[in-house]
C-alpha cells in the first residue's frame, strides 16, 4: 500500500471532520490502495492547531500554510479554510505539484475555478471538491418543499 502524506489546512469543524475521516478510512472502507498519513495540520490559531494535532495524531503542526504547501514531504493538500482563501491555496498547491481535496466551493467564481481546473489538468494534478452534504436527506426534503411552491 502506498502511503500519502496529508497536509490539512484549517482546523475548524470541517477540518476536524476530515481528520476523523482519514483516521477512520480503513475501518469504513477496508484495505485501500493507499494509506493517508496525517503529516501536518495547519491553523492560524496555534492553540487550536496543537489541540487538533494531539487529538487526531498529526505528526506536525504549522501556522504557515505556504510553508506547508511548499513542503516536499506533502503529497495531498486538504483545504478547509474560509471560502475566499481557497483559490490562493489551491493555486500554489497545484503549482507545487500537490494533489488537492478542497471543501466546497473551489473558488468564489466560475472563472477562477476554471483556471484552477485547467492548471491542474496541465500539471497532472488530481483534484476533488468536497460536496459532503449533496446526498443529505435534509437537502432532498428542502428541495421538495421548494419545488412544491
Give the predicted meaning of each segment:
Residues 1-56:
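N-terminal Rossmann-like dinucleotide-binding module
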Residues 59-64:
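Conserved SAM-binding strand-loop segment of SAM-dependent methyltransferases
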Residues 38, 58, 74-77:
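Local beta-strand N-terminus motif with an aromatic residue
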Residues 51-58, 115, 119-120:
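Short, conserved SAM-binding/catalytic segment
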Residues 10, 104, 149:
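Conserved G/P- and acidic residue-centered "switch" motifs that form tight phosphate/ATP-binding loops
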Residues 76, 82-134:
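Beta-strand-loop-alpha-helix segment that lines the small-molecule cofactor/substrate pocket
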Residues 135-149:
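Oxidoreductase and adenylate-handling cofactor-binding alpha/beta cores
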Amino acid at each position: 500500500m502506498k502511503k500519502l502524506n496529508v497536509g490539512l489546512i484549517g482546523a475548524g469543524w470541517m477540518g476536524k471532520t476530515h481528520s476523523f475521516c482519514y483516521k477512520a478510512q480503513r475501518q469504513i472502507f477496508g484495505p485501500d490502495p493507499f494509506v493517508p498519513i496525517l503529516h501536518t495540520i495547519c491553523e492560524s490559531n496555534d492553540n487550536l492547531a496543537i489541540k487538533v494535532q494531539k487529538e487526531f495524531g498529526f505528526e506536525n503542526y504549522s501556522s504557515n500554510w505556504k510553508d506547508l504547501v511548499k513542503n516536499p514531504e506533502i503529497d495531498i493538500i486538504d483545504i478547509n479554510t474560509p471560502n475566499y482563501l481557497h483559490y490562493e491555496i489551491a493555486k500554489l498547491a497545484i503549482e507545487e505539484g500537490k494533489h488537492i481535496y478542497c471543501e466546497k466551493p473551489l473558488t468564489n467564481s466560475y472563472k477562477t475555478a476554471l483556471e484552477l481546473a485547467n492548471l491542474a489538468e496541465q500539471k497532472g494534478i488530481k483534484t476533488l471538491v468536497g460536496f459532503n452534504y449533496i446526498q443529505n436527506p435534509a437537502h432532498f426534503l428542502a428541495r421538495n418543499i421548494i419545488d412544491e411552491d
